[in-house]
């Protein structure tokens, strides 16, 4: 698992993220992919040291799944509306919010008396990221080009739907 985590991060490095500065949509997805590597490294650490088994779960679910799922959903909605994903201003900030939520959640495991404040900060960043994702999905849904049916494709009068 340690080798797999290192290979994921090495592969990400070979994609040259610094060359994609003009593509925030791709940078956001790369950030989510980086959380997969971090999660694998934390899993290897948990097998050797047993500090907090939940750290791996949080890296995968909050960091990787949050950034990748929101990024892919938004890219699909933008492309369906015939927009340009690289022009969407919130794709990278959303990935950064999910990353902030993951980092705060991981820090809460070792924070001592400040664990609750970090946990609330993580929950706030995570909720804000999903709220902004929903808002942008609605925005792009409204802009989706609706294909009109050709009058020849409309059902004829007297047509009844099959079923009960």
Segments predicted by a language model, with ranges:
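Hydrophobic alpha-helical transmembrane segments of multi-pass integral membrane proteins
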Residues: 1-164
């Amino acid at each position: 698992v340690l080798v797999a985590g290192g290979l994921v991060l090495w592969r990400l490095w070979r994609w040259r993220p610094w060359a994609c500065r003009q593509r925030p949509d791709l940078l956001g997805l790369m950030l989510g992919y980086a959380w997969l590597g971090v999660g694998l490294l934390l899993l290897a650490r948990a097998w050797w040291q047993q500090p907090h088994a939940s750290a791996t779960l949080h890296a995968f679910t909050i960091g990787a799944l949050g950034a990748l799922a929101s990024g892919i959903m938004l890219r699909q909605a933008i492309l369906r509306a015939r927009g340009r994903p690289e022009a969407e201003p919130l794709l990278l900030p959303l990935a950064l919010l999910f990353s902030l939520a993951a980092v705060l959640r991981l820090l809460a495991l070792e924070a001592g008396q400040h664990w609750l404040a970090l946990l609330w900060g993580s929950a706030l960043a995570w909720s804000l990221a999903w709220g902004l994702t929903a808002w942008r999905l609605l925005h792009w849904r409204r802009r989706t080009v609706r294909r009109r049916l050709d009058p020849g494709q409309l059902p004829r009068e007297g047509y009844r739907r099959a079923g009960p």
